[in-house]
Amino acid sequence: YFPVVAGNQQENGQERQYLSKVSVDLSYVFFEKFPEPSERVKLSLAFCEPESLWSYEPASFDLPGELFIRQQHSKNIFQKAGSVVLYGICTLLLPVWLLDGVLAVKGLHPLHEAAAGRHGKSAVIYHAHGLVHDLTGYGYSVREYKTGYFKKCYEHACRKVPQTKGILFLSERRVENGGNLDRIRACVQEKGLSYREFLTETPVHKLSRKQIRECAEMVAEAKLIILEDFVPQLHALTMRPETQILQMWHACGAFKLFGLSELGVVDHLTQSSRNHRSYTAALASSSGVVPFYSEAFGIDERCVRPVGVPRTDVFFDTAYREQIREALYTRYPVCRDKKVILFAPTFRGSGNKTAYYPWEKFSVEKLMRELPQESVLILKNHPFVRDCCEIPEEYQDRVLDLSREENINDLLFITSVLITDYSSVIFEAVLLNIPILFYTFDLQEYLEKRDLYFEFAAFAPGKIISDMEALIKAAAGLLDDPTEETSPAMTKTQFQRLFLDALDGHSTQRTMQLVEELLATGD
């Protein structure tokens, strides 16, 4: 699937028309395996209704395979030497490029796409980097340099290691207790399967050269690499054909655009991106979201396996739920016999490095002043966001910041009302039938920068609110009477059928069967 943003035009009961203009580079439709020049490749058009009903248009294109073959341009030794010399000259002229970046930041001319989503000094530096990189193929990005070093270490390790074996758990986000990776790792240990792990919250540009070498060697040796999020440096590699990669994506459903679905929405993503496209298999929470994951990861639909999401199994385990509730009440006695509001927003920004939340838009003081005394507020930041709001002294006994302390799934077991925005936590909340309030003060801005798979108003299983005063009133109303929840356009039953039909308490078991299947591939 190649995503196309289209405008819907319909007048006076006439047929709907979808108008769009897009340029598709056919040489990047396929990842590494290209068709033969004599083969024919059929392209067709499709669109998705809000109910996830896909319709395929009769119009299609039958094109020769040669149009899809990417021409590989490798530099000879003289061209490489010339690029190095030119890079040296450009470095001497670095003040010129930086001045050009300052002018671009001030809006006097366009900012280079390498600086998309950045501001201030960071935008100036990445603008200069982009200009020099375009001219020479080299730049000043620490991430690019260390990713290149990772690639060289991997290629060297592949020559040393004749045969792959075992499992590698790879992540650069915090591994939560009870999360996908944690549960599958426990099963691997129980079965006595050979595994290694490289788990860090440090992105590649902050890793030492020694750490990069260690990681590259582990990747080269692994028969199966298991992820639960995006690991960007992995996609710079041309993987060994016998290596399998399983993406256990951390989120359920399909809410915010992610991966390659953001083509045409975010400036820094181009069709030539290798991101995600090397996955052998990816988990999905329902058959209804398979096309979206296929599009987002740039992989065949057959590689998206709707076997469920392992971390959701606990929602079907009554004994576990009671055990966790009691453990949380023991650690946080203020929550016992209280009505708990969980505030769990997603991040703003373009990713891990730039993530933030505009806390000036959420007033803890105003909210707690109006809520009943027997209520408690828990703040749970997205893992990418480092800073949280200040908790007023008079409410520190009723407000807990557990952003770095607890698994968000576990917190849902003691939650009376969830306040969120565009976070995928809504899927788990629906499983537990928790009332949801969507505090979306920046909806239009968010849609312009990130966008969603569905129209928000037709999709959200809860009340949509845009200002703090209305949020306070709605939260107080739900604490007083949970049945007061406004009927959303899509009922929770419809929502669950569309996004969560593979979740039944046995996702971990099915995922382990897939792990063993991938390990056996090629044996």
Predicted regions and their residues:
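N-terminal pre-catalytic "stem/leader" segment of glycosyltransferase-like enzymes
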Residues: 82, 86-220, 224
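Conserved catalytic-core segment of nucleotide-activated headgroup transferases in glycan assembly
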Residues: 176-187, 310-391, 465
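A donor-sugar binding/catalytic signature common to diverse glycosyltransferases
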Residues: 225-254, 406-450
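Aromatic sugar-binding surface patches on proteins
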Residues: 16-32
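Donor nucleotide-activated moiety binding/catalytic core segment of transferases
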Residues: 209-224, 232, 378, 383-427
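C-terminal amphipathic helix plus adjacent low-complexity
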Residues: 75-83, 89-112, 320, 468-523
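Catalytic binding pocket for nucleotide-activated donors in carbohydrate/polymer assembly enzymes
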Residues: 392-395, 424-499
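Active-site and donor-binding regions of nucleotide-sugar-utilizing enzymes
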Residues: 165-319
